[in-house]
Design a protein with these regions (language model features):
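Membrane-proximal amphipathic alpha-helices
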Residues: 52-56
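Membrane-embedded transmembrane helical bundles of large multi-pass transporters/channels
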Residues: 1-47, 142-406, 527-534, 539-660
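Short hinge/gating elements
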Residues: 48-51, 409-411
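Short, conserved active-site loops that position catalytic residues or coordinate cofactors/metal ions
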Residues: 44-46, 78-83
């Protein structure tokens, strides 16, 4: 242990000495590297891949593949063209909707779609108003078409089918909504970044009362940001896949938080060294020697904790893990070298007008209030009372998370005037909302044909299920044609298509599906189909799979993150009980944060749900980021505890650490 401590101490002293002594080279070198990196950084691309939201072994994905294999065509698509005229679509416009869809099937349409599935709300059409005002056409494309290519092709299709009086509205569906969401993120992220940086600058300025401290923090962000984006660009280039657009806000939030924390750690220690009477360069060196181990340990813990996301079954989290880990690693490396060098270069201006401690004591005689409170709180009786009170508050706040509702409703989450949402609203004026993403129920009997009477009875039962506006199935299949969308030739597989009466990606639709799944054994048994297997396909089933996967992954990811934190904190502290207690507090604080989030967004603001991956990504960030503060506080207490009783060490170190 002593040899390892000596080696790490030598490395710390060497790095601190180099950063301070070579400050005139280090600062411009990092600035030049940031400029070059910014010229070659483009990891987030509009129209790039959407999130990999569904586990590869999802039953819904298998059912979707089975449906396509058995019936040769899906019941719907993720790209839908919408036409609507409140006065009614003309007969000519309706005829063009059908004719254009037929042209797609025959390969005579230049959109590139493999299949077009048109629906018009004519009188008697299921799950519709029946007033001939609305037409929706599901366009099915091959896998070689990128999301943006599909949307562009759908827009061209709409322009052709809607002229001159076809009342075009727009293109909607899951894929257009996600692309629109990504575009909005990329268009607004710059403003959000600017406002966030300005807020950080103001906070640092107010806390340190020193313009130089804000300059150091902003300069560090300015250097770390382009270098991080370049590193992520290289990862995307090597892997052959640009990062999902939804990742950028998480990367930005993490980078700004980590860089700000580390810069503040150095600045706070540098100010303390100056107040103790050290000269500027000596203070910079001493501050670097004190903070470098803390930043390095915190960065390693945070990076490895984020890599624990690789344990997820969701592609989104697996993609997120290396991106966030690299973000932390770059922030750590920049902070370890650039920040001490910049502080040494600026000298006292970095925290000007900081006064020596003697002047502070003279201006405010007596023991400072912070250490007195910390010394009082460190006494065991009062510490126990404070701990119990804090735990009670955290538990109460955390209990609010029980009402958390997870959703995947990407369309309804868009601004009201966005193209996909406008088109979806127009479609919902003529059809039930589920017409944009119908649910497929596939019933199969591997040994013999399914009884027609039983299928007819089951179809009637499905139409009466709560949460669904209509259903079609084998009873609607036209006999004597080669098209068999509901019943296979051998009669061993049947497909029922159900239309939800609510947003098909909402928590309500997922609950309706869960209720249907629970009722299906009884429904099938009463129809004489008890021996048949049942599968569920469609966007609602996929949304259910995604939410279930995240919920199922939550414990696995949490255990992985906590284990990494525990092991590394134990190595850093050379203890086991203290890391366990700190992790327990972290878990309670994360639960409380999640509970307050649920209360504010669902109860106060009235949102029906929270996007399903946000709470878990946020929880991982909170647990990991809090480890930085644990390392900082514990490191300072441990250092003070080498020469004084623990209570006095806490009284001395806690106020100084809290200022950072």
């Amino acid at each position: 242990v002593s040899r390892r401590s000596h080696a790490s101490g030598f490395a710390t002293r060497l790095l601190a000495w180099l950063a301070v002594r070579l400050r005139f080279l280090v600062v411009p070198a990092f600035a030049a590297a940031a400029v070059l990196a910014g010229l070659h950084a483009d990891p987030f691309q509009t129209g790039g891949p959407v999130l990999d939201l569904i586990p590869k072994d999802s039953p819904a994905l298998k059912a979707q593949a089975d449906s396509l294999r058995l019936f040769r065509a899906p019941a719907g698509s993720d790209v839908i063209v919408v036409q609507r005229d409140p006065a009614g679509l003309s007969r000519d416009a309706q005829s063009r909707v059908i004719a254009q869809a037929v042209a797609v099937g025959r390969g005579h349409d230049r959109s590139g779609a493999q299949l077009a599935i048109p629906f018009i709300n004519v009188p008697g059409a299921p799950a519709s108003t029946g007033d001939s005002t609305t037409a929706i056409t599901h366009l099915v494309f091959g896998g070689s078409y990128s999301p943006t290519e599909r949307i562009r092709a759908a827009q061209g299709y709409l322009a052709r089918v809607a002229r001159p009086d076809g009342a075009p509205v727009g293109v909607t569906g899951v894929t257009p909504a996600r692309i629109e969401q990504g575009t909005l993120i990329l268009n607004r992220i710059g403003l959000v970044e600017l406002l966030t940086v300005l807020v950080i600058a103001v906070i640092v300025l107010v806390v340190f009362r020193a313009p130089g401290a804000a300059v150091v923090t902003m300069a560090t962000i300015g250097v770390a940001f382009p270098i991080t984006l370049w590193a992520l660009t290289e990862i995307a280039r090597i892997s052959g896949s640009p990062l999902p657009q939804e990742v950028e806000p998480l990367v930005v939030a993490l980078l700004l938080g980590v860089v700000t924390d580390y810069a503040v750690f150095f600045l706070s220690e540098f100010r303390d060294q100056l107040r103790s009477g050290a000269e500027s360069r000596d203070a910079a060196t001493a501050a670097a020697q004190a903070v470098i181990p803390i930043v390095f340990t915190g960065g390693v813990i945070l990076s490895l904790s984020l890599l624990a996301l690789r344990a997820s079954s969701l592609g989104f989290f697996r993609q997120l893990a290396p991106a966030l880990a690299v973000t932390v690693a770059v922030a750590m490396l920049v902070s370890l070298v650039f920040v001490p060098a910049l502080i040494a270069l600026l000298g006292r201006f970095a925290v000007w007008p900081t006064r020596p401690q003697a002047e502070v004591d003279e201006a405010a005689p007596g023991r400072p209030i912070g250490p007195r409170i910390a010394h009082l709180a460190a006494g065991r009786p009062l510490a126990a009372l404070i701990g119990i009170a804090c735990v009670a508050v955290l538990v109460f706040a955390g209990l609010q998370a029980r009402s958390l509702k997870l959703g995947v409703d990407v369309i309804s989450g868009l601004p009201a005037d966005s193209g996909p949402r406008v088109a979806a609203r127009a479609a919902a004026a003529g059809f039930a909302p589920g017409a944009l993403a119908p649910l497929e129920v596939i019933v199969r009997n591997r040994e013999s044909a399914l009884p027609p009477a039983g299928l007819a009875q089951l179809e009637q039962q499905l139409r009466s299920q709560p949460g669904y506006a209509g259903a079609v199935g084998p009873a609607e299949q036209v006999k004597g044609t080669s098209v068999q969308p509901f019943l296979t030739r051998d009669g061993r597989a049947a497909r029922f298509v159900l239309v939800s009466d609510t947003d098909p990606l909402s928590p309500a639709a997922v609950r309706d599906l869960a209720h249907l799944q629970a009722q299906m054994p009884g429904l099938a048994g009463s129809a004489g189909l008890g021996g048949a297997s049942v599968e569920y396909a469609g966007q609602t089933a996929l949304a259910q799979s995604a939410v279930d996967a995240v919920s199922g992954d939550a414990l696995k990811i949490a255990l992985a993150v906590l284990l990494v934190n525990l092991v590394l904190m134990a190595l850093f502290m050379r203890a086991l009980l203290a890391p366990l207690v700190l992790l327990a507090v972290n878990v309670l604080s994360v639960a409380a944060t999640l509970g307050l989030t649920v209360w504010f967004f669902q109860d106060v603001l009235g949102y029906p749900d929270i996007t399903y991956y946000v709470p878990f990504a946020g929880a991982v960030l909170l647990v990991s980021l809090s480890s930085d503060y644990n390392v900082l506080i514990v490191g300072k207490i441990w250092a003070e505890g080498e020469n004084r009783p623990m209570r006095d060490a806490i009284a001395s170190a806690a106020p100084r650490a809290s200022r950072a």
